[in-house]
Amino acid sequence: MFLGTYTPKLDDKGRLTLPAKFREELAGGLMVTKGQDHSLAVYPREEFAARARKAAAVSRTNPEARAFIRNLAASADEQRPDGQGRITLSAAHRTYAGLSKECVVIGSVDFLEIWDAAAWAAYQEETEAAFSSAEGEFLGDFL
């Protein structure tokens, strides 16, 4: 399970060091793709494959489904962390997410998200009130 918030730096070659606690789960390979809210999503390869198959099973006659599948597949990049736990983020992914040197990696239960640190701070500020008001509705049984 992927949980927590981490602040690795992006180096000049576009490499990002994954949090040590997630490396074993991602050692078999991972997929980086566009995520929600201009973040990047990082899935274990098997999890991504299962989600992609499910998305592809949706009727291809639906224009929205076709667009989603095309964007998902076109933006996916298979990676295998190097010996130091680093992955190289493509220029297209870095641009999409607006990544600077300062990044934030957050656990989202079954995948990771990579954010630019300033964008993550702004997102948290924007959504804090909504999180507080929805807490009881969505987490009532959890709390």
From Swiss-Prot:
Keyword hit for Cell division: no
InterPro entries listed in its UniProt record: MraZ, MraZ_C, MraZ_dom, MraZ_N, MraZ_sf, SpoVT-AbrB_dom, SpoVT-AbrB_sf
Sorted UniProt keywords: Cytoplasm, DNA-binding, Repeat, Transcription, Transcription regulation
GO function term, MF aspect, one: DNA-binding transcription factor activity
Domain SpoVT-AbrB per the UniProt entry, residue ranges: 5-47, 76-119
Subcellular location: Cytoplasm, Nucleoid
Ranges in coiled-coil conformation: none
Predominant cellular place of this UniProt entry's protein: cytoplasm
PROSITE patterns given in the database record: SPOVT_ABRB
One GO BP: negative regulation of DNA-templated transcription initiation
Subunit structure: Forms oligomers.
Family: Belongs to the MraZ family.
Protein name (Swiss-Prot/TrEMBL): Transcriptional regulator MraZ
Originating species: Corynebacterium diphtheriae (strain ATCC 700971 / NCTC 13129 / Biotype gravis)
Gene: mraZ
